[in-house]
Amino acid sequence: MEQTEHEERTPAKELLTVEQLKRAWLWSEPVEFGDPILAHTRLDRHAMFYPLGFPVSVMTNSDAVLDAAREGWGWFTCRFDREPIRLKVAVTEDNSRVCPPTPVCRMRDHMVTNIADSENFAVTDLSSQFSTIWATEAAVRHRDYFRYFFLESTAMGCVSSAHATAIHAGCVALDDEGILLCGDSGAGKTTLSYACAHAGWTYVTDDGSYLVHGEADRLVTGNCHQARFRPSAEALFPQLRGREVMRRAGAGKPSIELPIKPGNAIRTSATANVRYMVFLERNVHKEELTPFPRVVGRMYLWQTIRCMPYETSRHLKAIDALLEVKTFELRYNSLEWAVERLKQLVREGR
């Protein structure tokens, strides 16, 4: 969205000199103090969103920021009674139309920084569930970049620190029994999740699952409203053909984002109760489902925890509770075979 006529950006102003202050006093002129660090930028637009069901308050001076948040989170409703995460997003003027570089993320104790350049960055305090984001108009115009690196990363960082344990896994369910599909990048989590959904399973998420703290029976939530595929998935799913291939400022691998809307013949759910964990390996000599060592599963889950030191024990306890389920490795080549083998696992327990 382009800047509207009502969106007036307040430029940084240097402090007044002594002479300017004297002149204003002598002539009884109104004084407008300088604000070189934009500390008084008005954030006069506000909306509440519920990504993955958690409340997030967004305050900003830009309608385009709210549009971006609405695009990513507009489908979600409040599911979890938590104190709202607070994002304050200030947008500044610039003359560029170039997308900023990929941010560099660093964390120490309860502070997280996400810095693209001197004008585009976020600072998050996990202990207070608050983030301040500064972005240029050029960054916000590149909506996919802005959503992914600033809105989603800060909000989900707060969620995964205090409210849930983030797991690099897809999630699908059959007969109300959820399966986490785990594995390295490229193992096929998204394609197998989507193939299961087309075979009548319930789709929860493609590769970002969150094990919710304080909920019974290993409750996982995820973004059931979209899936992000590698371009090579066009050969597997015709509905991906012709869609834009996105690459976020050179970060990561190119992807195709597919919205999954209600009524498009795929059953979705925002949550599932996990009964099985399955680690995926593709391009194998022999297709089979075999037991997977839990100690390796524990290390896989532990290595992605990003939280304050005093929150670590809560995450480790959640992971150990999750690992009480049966854990397997699915070695496969054919999506059809993999879907049928997972169905057998749910129906027969082996």
Show which residues each predicted segment covers.
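A noncatalytic interaction/capping subdomain that flanks phosphate/NTP-handling catalytic cores
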Residues: 2-185, 198-204, 209-350
